[in-house]
Structures are given as C-alpha cells and as structure tokens.
C-alpha cells in the first residue's frame, strides 16, 4: 500500500476554515485573558522532554584546526543553549499545525494499477484534537458503559448489562499550578501531576481487591486528562490539566472506599493539596440506574466533545498545546474496558446494512492468544462477555 499527502483544497477551493476563528485570533484571546500564563515558558526544568518544534535553540560558530598542519580548519555551528518556548507561542504553533492538518488529505492506494483489484482513495488527515477523533472516543465510552451497565444501541436494540449491580465512581486528581507561590510552566505541571499515577493505580487495584473486586471481572476504569476551564472550581488552575478516573464497579461502593486512592495521590504528588482532595471534592459515586444519561454524565467530566479545536474554550486550547508539546497521552483504559468497547462496536457492525460482517459478537468462539484469556469471540477478537 502506498500513500501520499496533499492539500485538501488542491490550491483552488475556498478556505474551509473561513467560518472558524484563526489561530492568531485565538492566541490573541489567550494573551488578553491569561497574560500571566502566555509569557510563561512551557517548562524551566533541565532535561524536560519536549517536541523539538516547541523549543528554541542558540548556536555559535566554531572553528577547529585540522588534524594535520596542512589540513583546512573545521568550521561549523554548535548548539550552546536550548529552552522551551512560551505558552503563547506553543498555542500558536499547535493551532497552526492543526489548521494545516484540516486542509490535508492522505491519498492511499492498494496494489498496482495493473491489478484487477487495484484501489485508490483519499482520507482526511486527522489528529487527536479533531472533532471526528473526539466523536469516536465518545462512542467508545458509550459502548463501554452500555456493555457494563446496559442500554439501548443506535439500532434500537438493547444491550443487557454485564454487571448485576453497576456503580460508577468519578475520581478527580489535580495539582496546584502555584505550589510555592510562583506559577509553574504547564508541561512541568503536567509531568509532576502525572508522576503519581503508577502508585495511585496500584493503590486503586489493591483497595478494590481488599473489598473483593478483581480488575476486569468486577471493575474497570477509564482515565482521562482534561483542563481546568472554569466550569468547576476557581480560576487559579485554569488552562492546567487534571485527571478524571471513571470507575465502574459491579457492586455497591461509596466515596469513602476511594479514600486510600486520593490520599496516595496527595502523598505522592508534591503539588497536590489536601484541601482540593477532600472526598466531597475528589470523589463522586452513583448507582448506574440513578443516572439517566450515563455516558453524557461521564463525558461532561472528561471534556469529550465533538468540537473543532479552534472553537474550544481558550483554556482547553492552552492545555492542548501543552500536552501536544510534551507529546503525552491523555487517555488510558483498563484492557477489559477496551474489550467491552470493542464488543459494542462489533454488535453495531453486525446490525448495520453498510457492513458485511458475518457474525454478531459472541456468536463464534476461538482460542485466544491474549494473556489471561483462554477464549475470545471470532469477530474483532474481543474476550468481553
């Protein structure tokens, strides 16, 4: 298979972004609303990992004598200093790259032109900040929750819940952006806040196990980062990130059950404060049947919206530029949650007249090569159910 890339406009069409604000307009908004943040460098920590285009470098020319007297001197340039760009510059570069990608298509071909089954087609280039990408993630979350808690599929058919007594916990983990009275760069903040996750994960798993719940069979999770935007809380941390962990448990749980998890984050993350992580602020638990639109309820916490990046709140755009510069993941899920979402997609494809899928999910079983599973369903390879 070969592929090539070209401008979606072909150089002739009108600009598809004409109805959207420009990158420069959004950057101006960021500078106007958050001037104290716009001129911050993304990080001042030596050794911080950043994509090269989000750094500035200074070079000096040098000249060294040749190895032998009659050899010409060696001349060149060497990097003598490198630092992160400012947050405002990162916003501009992220939005410019995004706008360029919106105008780009990827041309694909399969086989050779002389082959009877030769095919060629084009697809829109895409990044994780596209509304189409966000829409897929939202569909996966809906499918996951539908498999565990039950619900109606787009076809009108109903999925029976895999869990008998599903409860949903939302755990929020954050960190101060002014830990010592001085505002820190967003990439440094992102790294420090996320460093607690390994310890938090093990504490969560062990806490659930102590209550008789095993990961995968009795509970699953979906962890997502999102920015502080002002919809909840004050403006001190606006534009900086925090994490929401959506946990679905097959059994009754309450906020106090997750106290060790929150305490582990506060203990491990040096910028996490106890006040912001009191149980009434950091944990919310509901029985799934109490929430009319469960996926919408969870998605509202996780900032999953099929909205163009250029139209997102400026706080979201600023946060996106920071995680883009650091090239960090903003989503992680338990394997069982991925398998459940895949099972839902399999059911929907089997019901769709536009797909030629032969079997529904769970109609045919084959041996599984996945660790910890003996069998999986033939279509799409999901062991869920």
Show which residues each predicted segment covers:
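Right-hand nucleic-acid polymerase module
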Residues: 1-239, 251-385
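Short hydrophobic/aromatic beta-strand micro-patches
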Residues: 246-250
């Amino acid at each position: 298979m070969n592929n090539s890339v070209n401008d979606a406009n072909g150089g002739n069409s009108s600009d598809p972004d004409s109805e959207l604000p420009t990158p420069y307009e959004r950057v101006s908004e960021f500078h106007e609303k958050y001037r104290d943040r716009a001129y911050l460098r993304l990080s001042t920590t030596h050794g911080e990992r950043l994509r090269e285009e989000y750094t500035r470098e200074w070079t000096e020319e040098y000249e060294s004598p040749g190895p032998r007297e009659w050899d010409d001197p060696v001349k060149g340039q060497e990097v003598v200093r490198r630092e992160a760009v400012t947050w405002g510059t990162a916003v501009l570069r992220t939005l410019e790259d995004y706008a360029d990608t919106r105008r780009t298509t990827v041309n694909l071909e399969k086989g050779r032109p002389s082959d009877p089954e030769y095919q060629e087609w084009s697809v829109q280039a895409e990044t994780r900040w596209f509304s189409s990408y966000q829409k897929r993630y939202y569909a996966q979350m809906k499918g996951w929750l539908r498999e565990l808690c039950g619900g109606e599929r787009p076809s009108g058919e109903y999925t029976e819940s895999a869990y008998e007594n599903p409860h949903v916990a939302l755990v929020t983990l954050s960190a101060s952006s002014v830990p010592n009275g001085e505002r820190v760069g967003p990439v440094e903040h992102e790294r420090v806040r996320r460093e607690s996750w390994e310890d938090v994960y093990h504490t969560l798993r062990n806490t659930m196990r102590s209550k008789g719940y095993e990961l995968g069979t009795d509970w699953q999770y979906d962890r997502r980062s999102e920015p502080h935007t002002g919809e909840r809380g004050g403006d001190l941390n606006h534009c900086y990130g925090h994490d929401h962990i959506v946990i679905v448990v097959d059994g009754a749980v309450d906020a106090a059950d997750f106290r060790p998890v929150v305490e582990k984050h506060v203990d491990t993350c040096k910028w996490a404060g106890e006040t912001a992580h009191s149980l009434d602020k950091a944990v919310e638990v509901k029985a799934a049947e109490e929430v009319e639109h469960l996926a919408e309820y969870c998605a509202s916490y996780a900032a999953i919206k099929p909205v163009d990046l250029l139209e997102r709140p400026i706080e979201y755009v600023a946060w996106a530029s920071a995680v883009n510069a650091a090239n960090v993941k903003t989503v992680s899920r338990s394997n069982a949650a991925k398998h459940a979402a895949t099972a839902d997609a399999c059911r929907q494809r089997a019901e769709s007249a536009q797909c030629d899928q032969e079997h529904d999910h769970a109609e045919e079983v084959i041996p599984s090569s996945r660790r910890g599973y003996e069998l999986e369903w033939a279509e799409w390879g999901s062991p869920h159910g």
